[in-house]
Amino acid sequence: AEREIVRNIKEKLCYVALDFEQEMATPAASSSLEKSYELPDGQVITIGNERFRCPETLFQPAFIGMESAGIHETTYNSIMKCDIDIRKDLYANTVLSGGTSMYPGIADRMQKEITALAPSSMKIKIIAPPERKYSVWIGGSILASLSTFQQMWISKQEYDESGPSIVHRKCF
């Protein structure tokens, strides 16, 4: 039940700040920042800069003690590991997907952060389709409907015999 409450707060009140430091400088009691939320027991809580501080961990995982790159750096690093001939297309066609990509402001922030990392001549385009919350599921559904998908199936026996490498052999 508590997870559902947190998920509901996340979906209704949280957003990604375009400029985290500037947003933090906004007075904590600013009426534009504070929002009320009624808990199931009727208690009303006020949520202030937590609305954007929590999603900021996507860009600054160190906030929660994680030693990993932010989502923008991971995206940039992934593009840079690809063949140089396709990087331009990847920069111009970065598609957000999954429930966490539904935060208001995430596409603009990704645009800003990747633009800062990429070569200045590169055209950056972040695509945030409205149905992105379910696009991973939709993609899996499309894959499963392909006539060629059955040849990618892996039985437990095959996996036990070959380990994770069977995925690369059958699917790539």
UniProtKB/Swiss-Prot annotation:
Its main location: cytoplasm. It holds the Pfam family Actin. GO terms for cellular component: cytoplasm; cytoskeleton. It is found in: Cytoplasm, Cytoskeleton. One of its GO terms (molecular function) is hydrolase activity. InterPro entries: Actin, Actin_CS, ATPase_NBD. Keywords: ATP-binding, Cytoplasm, Cytoskeleton, Hydrolase, Muscle protein, Nucleotide-binding. Actins are highly conserved proteins that are involved in various types of cell motility and are ubiquitously expressed in all eukaryotic cells. Belongs to the actin family. This is Actin, muscle. It comes from Lytechinus pictus (Painted sea urchin).
